Amino acid sequence: MKLLLLALPILVLLPQVIPAYGGEKKCWNRSGHCRKQCKDGEAVKETCKNHRACCVPSNEDHRRVPTTSPTPLSDSTPGIIDNILTIRFTTDYFEISSKKDMVEESEAGQGTQTSPPNVHHTS
């Protein structure tokens, strides 16, 4: 039982002491490590997950960038499909007027004024 209690803290602390067990991720073309703080002689090249820095040894040339194959361009001459897919955008304009303007127009358009009908209530 004492051996188990002694082995348990060792297994818990082992990943913190040994980087290989700590799971430090590789970054920057597998030449750097993600850490909270870089060691002496290391430079920060990018940001890793969980707010960690990608620490790369500064004595090596790490300007290598992953190579990608160039994307071949198709025929650049416009075809019939390009003409069909051309969309012209139009904007509709609306005229906004106030109630006062509308009342003035309606009064000018009506030749005669009619009074509202009288309503009689009987009980």
Curated annotation (Swiss-Prot):
Belongs to the beta-defensin family. It is found in: Secreted. Transmembrane segments: none annotated. The three-dimensional structure formed by the three intramolecular disulfide bridges is indispensable for antimicrobial activity. Residues 1-19 form the signal peptide. It comes from Macaca fascicularis (Crab-eating macaque). Residues 66-77 have a biased composition (Low complexity). One of its GO terms (molecular function) is lipopolysaccharide binding. One of its GO terms (biological process) is negative regulation of lipopolysaccharide-mediated signaling pathway. Disulfide bonds join 27-54, 34-48, 38-55. Pfam families: Defensin_beta_2. Residues 65-123 form a propeptide. Residues 58-77, 100-123 are annotated as: Disordered. Host defense peptide that exhibits antimicrobial activity against both Gram-negative bacteria, such as E.coli and S.typhimurium, and Gram-positive bacteria, such as S.aureus and B.subtilis. Inhibits cell adhesion of E.coli on intestinal epithelial enterocytes. Causes rapid permeabilization of both the outer and inner membrane of E.coli, leading to morphological alterations on the bacterial surface. Binds to bacterial lipopolysaccharides (LPS) with high affinity, and may thereby be involved in immunoregulation through LPS neutralization. Keywords: Antibiotic, Antimicrobial, Cleavage on pair of basic residues, Defensin, Disulfide bond, Secreted, Signal. This is Defensin beta 118. Residues 109-123 have a biased composition (Polar residues). One of its GO terms (cellular component) is extracellular region.
